């Protein structure tokens, strides 16, 4: 007598043990699949930045990403290269440029100029913050580097005061006055009053010369003398007056004028 399996068609008498295993089912939450946009072009700066990091891009390509489009029918990469070339291919010189320079460059315009100005200001503030964290008052070079970074490229005169404690630790940094290209109103009594409020034992004052020249004027020397004498009345000391240019500084203390 034949077994039912032998009598049945081959497809119906297959041993269950020989049947292929059913694929395992994923019972957990669906796993997200990384999908690239349909217009993904791995050779373009944006895509290379996302895949390989910003170090993979040239200076001009980074600028092109900020510009977004070239404007006025211009190629964005050509606009970025031309803008960088205007500053001798120097990102530092570009960051130090006057804000209105960007808007007047062909293909940039107001909107793109605003983006560039915002980025340069973000970079400047980050560098100032980092320099302040590392600032050592007992190191004249570090103080001058900090001041040059903070006010060296300002288009107008700015007066800055560093208030220090008895151990020359930094209490606060304040911009006490701002002025025109050639004139600025500084009130010693306000600086002395602020020193009393902060209980400061010593001060360093500084201002910039937008012209770039750091030679002190007669008015600079007079202000230094008046403030030095006023601070002495409250037992506080003026440690230095630093005149800041775009690339250099002048220290009253180093010159022996304090």
Curated annotation (Swiss-Prot):
- A biological process from GO: proteolysis
Which residue numbers does the motif JAMM motif cover? 207-220
**Where is the stretch described as Disordered?**
1-43
The residues listed in the UniProt record as binding Zn(2+), with positions renumbered to this chain, are: 207, 209, 220
MPN domain location: 136-258
Please provide the record's keywords in A-Z order. Hydrolase, Metal-binding, Metalloprotease, Protease, Zinc
Q: Which GO terms describe its molecular function?
A: metal ion binding; metallopeptidase activity
CDD domains xrefs: MPN_DUF2466 (cd08071)
Give me the stretches of Basic residues compositional bias.
31-43
The family classification in the record reads: Belongs to the UPF0758 family.
Q: Which protein is depicted?
A: UPF0758 protein Bamb_2548
Task: Record the organism.
Answer: Burkholderia ambifaria (strain ATCC BAA-244 / DSM 16087 / CCUG 44356 / LMG 19182 / AMMD)
């Amino acid at each position: 007598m034949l077994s039912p399996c032998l009598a049945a068609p081959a497809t119906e008498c297959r041993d269950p043990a020989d049947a292929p295993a059913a694929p395992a089912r994923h019972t957990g939450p669906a796993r997200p699949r990384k999908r690239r946009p349909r217009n993904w072009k791995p050779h373009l700066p944006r895509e290379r930045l996302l895949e390989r990091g910003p170090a993979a891009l040239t200076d001009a390509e980074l600028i092109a990403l900020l510009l977004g489009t070239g404007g006025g029918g211009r190629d964005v990469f050509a606009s970025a290269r031309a803008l960088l070339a205007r500053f001798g291919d120097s990102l530092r010189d570009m960051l130090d440029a006057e804000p209105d320079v960007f808007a007047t460059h062909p293909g940039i315009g107001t909107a793109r100029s605003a983006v560039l100005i915002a980025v340069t200001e973000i970079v400047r503030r980050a560098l100032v913050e980092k320099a302040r964290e590392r600032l050592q008052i007992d190191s004249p070079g570090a103080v001058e580097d900090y001041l040059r970074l903070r006010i060296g490229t300002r288009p107008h005169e700015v007066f800055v005061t560093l208030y220090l404690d008895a151990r020359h630790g930094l209490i606060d940094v304040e911009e006490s006055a701002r002025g025109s290209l050639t004139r600025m109103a500084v009130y010693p009594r306000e600086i002395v009053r602020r020193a009393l409020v902060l209980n400061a034992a010593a001060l360093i004052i500084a201002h910039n010369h937008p012209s770039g020249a750091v030679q002190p004027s007669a008015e600079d020397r007079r202000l230094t003398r008046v403030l030095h004498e006023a601070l002495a009345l409250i037992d506080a000391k003026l440690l230095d007056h630093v005149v800041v240019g775009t690339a250099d500084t002048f220290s009253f203390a180093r010159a022996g004028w304090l």
